[in-house]
């Protein structure tokens, strides 16, 4: 149909003579012949000529629509040529967002290019023409398909800015870190590690390695003494390296990682203005501290550091305040850590307003440059002692053409030469004073360590002396007993020996109350450290001397072992000592141990630890006194008592672990103090016996004492309801103060021994 209409148009053109122009127009117009044919078909033999502009402005419905984008490639080519021409004259090459796969600048001289923007293209590798740009300082390769960085990049020895983010890099080559880079952006790649050679980038000020798969940061990052901004967001980091605490960071972003702890040494980041740590399972500091902001985080880190170094809370390490205000004394306020006003040369780094934080302007005066270099030099010396906070970024400011300037750019340049020398002198004197203070504190710490070691040695010597004294006294008593045995054999007949049991019974009845209650009596109860005046229950007069000596050596070794075991168990068992005593010894004296001076009043034997006297020790009455000593307070009986307590505590641990299927720590008293384990045990015996249990959370890992007491009281109430008798029920302080584990074990044992039928009846009721 269209072809026939076109034919009509052509024939009409031949008949009228005007069709020639119409047909000519159609031929020249590229599709106009079809339009003319349509016109001829509609108008018969008459064809109306249509001007060319009208054809483009008002396309006919039956013809193909005109697409203005058909001319776009010609404009793109012209704009690309124009960009290359401008790059040759200005040194700035901008080819961003052109979907280029190959570099088009083969016919242009671009060797003087200083800035090249090749971002948002489709380069699979860095164009080889770029390696010819010797003076290149800035290279932007953002959003391409680059997989590797060739070694030819070493030709760009003036490159300070490199952005190769959002590409397909899996590793960073070692030769990349031989360049004088100040800004390196390699985010949104597939990096799994950072080479150790990154420590060579002494001038690096900004590093962005976010959105990768990095698991560990190298320790060599602590050598980046000029680093101001570090972005390690969205990686797989579990631990932050301690070396970052020595850097002069202004911004730190480690969000969206797996970090659980901020190192305490990060309290030295006194220039830090922005810290982003969200989306991390942080435990130290706790979540409620992190939500309060930067100041509270640093305060928490300072308190933790003081606790670890056994310092007082009023000796917090606040050197940043003294650096910002050398003429003002230090205070304990953590709010001064980051003042809102500018002080001294720290105009941008020490403020929170975010303005003028990173100034890239070069000092306009030689005195300003010298001041900056002097401050940086002093800071480098302090950094080597791990006690400084870096203010400058480099030692030589003239070498760095784009350093971060810490002098307020709004300050008049005229005032700098007048005050430059004063600033230099004040800072140098301040740092010298700081060195002296650090030396004094170091000496004080050394003296404290020496004193602590001396005290420990004295305590160890005292313990050894006590043990030696016990063994010496036993030897003396052994000699006296041997002498007594010889005298008895010589002076007494066989009939006297037959009546010995009867005399022993009479002597036991004749012990006076004065002897029992006397402060020097051998029956006086005393702690184990002074068990020198206690008697062993072994029948000494009946033993053979040689057998007794071998037995004595064995006992002395056993005493030494039990002595140190007792000291470790004394804290947990001290609350139960009075409860375990026999009723016959309830009224005995509990006075302080007898001093060594009292032993020497009568040649060391008048009140000997075995109740023996120098000459009357061989008489019958002294033997009766010796035989009447209560064996319940001997050292061996005390050791047996401690072994029983340890066995009960072990049984308590086994009961809890077997019933609850958990593993308790070595310090079982601390594990039971909050009452959570005991409440779970009660609910295990009878469900819902404890309605509510206060449990710790990751944000608050330790319960308050009020909540601990509430848990303990709920547990004891549940025990009463379940049928535990009052005699076998422990008291709250036995659990809360960790001093009655034996009583707690009795209560738990009673709870487990309840009949199942009774427990089921109670649950039904």
From Swiss-Prot:
Domain spans labelled Calponin-homology (CH): 642-755
Location of region: Disordered: 1-39, 55-76, 316-401, 498-552, 565-628
Biased composition (Polar residues): 518-529, 584-595
Residue stretches of each LRR repeat: 89-110, 112-133, 135-156, 158-179, 180-201, 203-224, 226-248, 249-269, 271-292
Biased composition annotated in UniProt, kind: Basic and acidic residues: 378-388, 503-512
Coiled coil: 438-472
Pfam families the record matches: CH, LRR_8
Keywords: Coiled coil, Leucine-rich repeat, Repeat
Function: May play a role in the organization of the cytoskeleton.
Protein's name according to its UniProt entry: Leucine-rich repeat and calponin homology domain-containing protein 2
Organism: Homo sapiens
Organism phylogeny: Eukaryota, Metazoa, Chordata, Craniata, Vertebrata
Originating gene: LRCH2
């Amino acid at each position: 149909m269209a072809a026939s209409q076109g034919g009509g148009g052509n024939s009409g053109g031949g008949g009228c003579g005007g069709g020639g122009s119409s047909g000519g127009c159609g031929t020249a117009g590229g599709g106009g012949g079809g339009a003319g044919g349509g016109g001829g078909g509609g108008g018969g033999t008459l064809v109306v000529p249509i001007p060319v502009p009208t054809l483009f402005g008002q396309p006919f419905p039956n013809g193909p629509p005109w697409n203005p984008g058909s001319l776009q490639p010609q404009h793109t080519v012209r704009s690309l040529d124009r960009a290359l021409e401008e790059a040759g004259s200005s040194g700035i090459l901008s080819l961003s967002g052109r979907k280029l796969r190959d570099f088009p600048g083969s016919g242009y001289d671009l060797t003087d290019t200083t800035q090249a923007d090749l971002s948002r293209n489709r380069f699979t590798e860095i164009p080889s023409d770029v390696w010819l740009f010797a003076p290149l300082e800035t290279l932007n390769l953002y959003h391409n398909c680059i997989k590797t960085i060739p070694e030819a990049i070493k030709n760009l020895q003036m490159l300070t800015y490199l952005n190769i983010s959002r590409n397909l890099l899996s590793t960073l080559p070692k030769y990349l870190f031989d360049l004088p880079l100040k800004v390196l952006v390699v985010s949104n790649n597939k990096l799994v590690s950072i080479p150790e050679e990154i420590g060579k980038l002494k001038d690096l000020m900004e590093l962005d390695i976010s959105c990768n798969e990095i698991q560990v940061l190298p320790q060599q990052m602590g050598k980046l003494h000029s680093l101001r901004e570090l972005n390690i967001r969205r990686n797989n980091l579990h631990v932050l390296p301690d070396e970052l605490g020595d850097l002069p960071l202004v911004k730190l972003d480690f969000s969206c990682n797996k970090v659980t702890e901020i190192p305490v040494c990060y309290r030295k980041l006194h220039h830090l203005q922005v810290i982003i740590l969200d989306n991390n399972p942080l435990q130290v500091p706790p979540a409620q501290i992190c939500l309060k902001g930067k100041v509270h985080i640093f305060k928490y880190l300072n308190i933790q550091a003081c606790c670890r170094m056994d310092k007082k809370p009023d000796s917090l390490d606040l050197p940043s305040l003294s650096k910002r205000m050398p003429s003002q004394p230090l205070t304990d306020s953590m709010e001064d850590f980051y003042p809102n006003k500018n002080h001294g040369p720290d105009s941008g780094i020490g403020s929170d307003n975010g303005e003028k934080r990173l100034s890239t302007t070069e000092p306009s005066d030689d005195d300003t440059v010298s001041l900056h270099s002097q401050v940086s030099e002093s800071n480098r010396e302090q950094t080597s002692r791990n006690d400084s906070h870096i203010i400058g970024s480099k030692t030589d400011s003239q070498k760095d053409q784009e350093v971060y300037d810490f002098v307020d750019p709004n300050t008049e340049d005229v005032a700098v030469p007048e005050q430059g020398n004063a600033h230099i002198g004040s800072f140098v004197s301040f740092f010298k004073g700081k060195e002296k203070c650090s030396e004094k504190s170091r000496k004080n710490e050394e003296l404290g360590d020496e004193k602590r070691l001396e005290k420990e040695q004295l305590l160890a010597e005292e313990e050894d002396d006590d043990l030696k004294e016990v063994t010496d006294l036993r030897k003396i008593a052994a000699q006296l007993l041997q002498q007594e045995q010889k005298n008895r054999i010589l002076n007494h007949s066989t009939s006297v020996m037959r009546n010995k049991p009867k005399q022993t019974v009479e002597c036991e009845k004749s012990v006076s109350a004065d002897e029992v209650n006397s402060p020097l009596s051998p029956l006086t109860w005393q702690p184990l450290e002074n068990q020198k005046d206690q008697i062993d229950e072994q029948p000494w007069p009946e033993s053979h001397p040689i057998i007794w000596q071998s037995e004595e050596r064995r006992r002395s070794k056993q005493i030494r072992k039990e002595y140190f075991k007792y000291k470790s168990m004394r804290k947990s068992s001290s609350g139960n000592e009075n409860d375990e005593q026999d009723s016959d010894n309830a009224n005995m004296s509990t006075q302080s141990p007898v001093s060594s001076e009292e032993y020497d009043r009568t040649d060391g034997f008048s009140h000997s630890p075995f109740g023996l006297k120098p000459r009357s020790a061989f008489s019958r009455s002294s033997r009766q006194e010796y035989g009447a000593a209560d064996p319940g307070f001997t050292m061996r009986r005390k050791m047996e008592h401690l072994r029983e307590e340890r066995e009960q505590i072990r049984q308590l641990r086994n009961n809890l672990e077997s019933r609850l299927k958990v593993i308790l720590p070595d310090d079982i008293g601390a594990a039971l103090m909050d009452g959570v384990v005991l409440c779970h045990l009660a609910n295990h015996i009878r469900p819902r016996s404890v309605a509510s249990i206060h449990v710790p959370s990751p944000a608050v890992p330790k319960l308050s004492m009020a909540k601990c007491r509430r848990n303990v009281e709920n547990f004891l109430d549940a025990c009463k309801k379940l049928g535990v008798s009052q005699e076998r029920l422990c008291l709250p302080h036995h659990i809360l103060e960790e001093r009655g584990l034996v009583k707690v074990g009795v209560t738990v044992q009673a709870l487990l021994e309840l009949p199942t039928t009774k427990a089921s009846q109670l649950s039904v009721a």
